[in-house]
């Protein structure tokens, strides 16, 4: 919306706060993102063309690489992961959850440290982790969103992405994503690949990789 009007245009209209946190709303671009997902799942050549068009519209019109005061959706930066572990800045559509209920439901699974008796806790072995994250020195998902687990018999890493910490930026805490910006890049890349446009597909994947701190050597 702010692509058509200055933010000041909405100040009077926004007295009730409706336009706040629009990346939680099922707004126009969230619908286009959902279209892209559904068309790709359908899988026919015609639907993949529609999926590509919808995903590209979201990427080109709704996304920005520059952080401004009124930015709706943008890439996570290096320093953002500490405040927004669920990557809220990249959400196109999501849920605002009750943190107490969520913590109670996930207490057995999402932990920052585990003992041998924490049988339900989610953790990743060292081998699995290093196989997934090809560059553990620079990949933000590795350096920012995993906690090393060195005690007990289950040595590995614990995921922090959905763990709500006291240090998280409160305006963007307690959020669970349903549609995120990187998915639009993946959908568009898959559609380009279906059209044998490997270069376009790789360009899109490279954008996501670079934004995660993964670079081609």
Residue positions per predicted region:
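N-terminal segment of the mature soluble domain
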Residues: 119-127
């Amino acid at each position: 919306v702010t692509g058509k009007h200055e933010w000041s245009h909405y100040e009077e209209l926004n007295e009730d706060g409706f336009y706040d946190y629009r990346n939680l709303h099922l707004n126009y671009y969230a619908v286009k993102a959902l279209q892209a997902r559904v068309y790709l799942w359908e899988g026919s050549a015609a639907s993949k063309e529609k999926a590509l068009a919808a995903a590209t519209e979201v990427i080109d019109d709704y996304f920005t690489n520059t952080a401004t005061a009124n930015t709706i959706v943008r890439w996570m930066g290096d320093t953002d992961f500490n405040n927004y572990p669920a990557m809220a800045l990249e959400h196109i559509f999501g849920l605002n959850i009750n943190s107490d209920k969520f913590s109670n439901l996930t207490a057995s699974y999402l932990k920052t440290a585990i003992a041998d008796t924490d049988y339900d806790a989610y953790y990743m072995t060292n081998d699995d982790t290093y196989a997934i994250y090809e560059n553990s020195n620079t990949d933000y998902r590795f350096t920012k969103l995993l906690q090393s687990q060195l005690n007990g018999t289950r040595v590995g890493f614990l995921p922090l992405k959905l763990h709500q910490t006291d240090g998280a930026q409160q305006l963007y805490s307690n959020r669970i994503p349903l549609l995120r910006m990187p998915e639009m890049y993946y959908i568009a890349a898959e559609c380009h690949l279906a059209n044998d446009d490997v270069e376009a597909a790789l360009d899109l994947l490279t954008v996501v990789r670079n934004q995660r701190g993964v670079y081609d050597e």
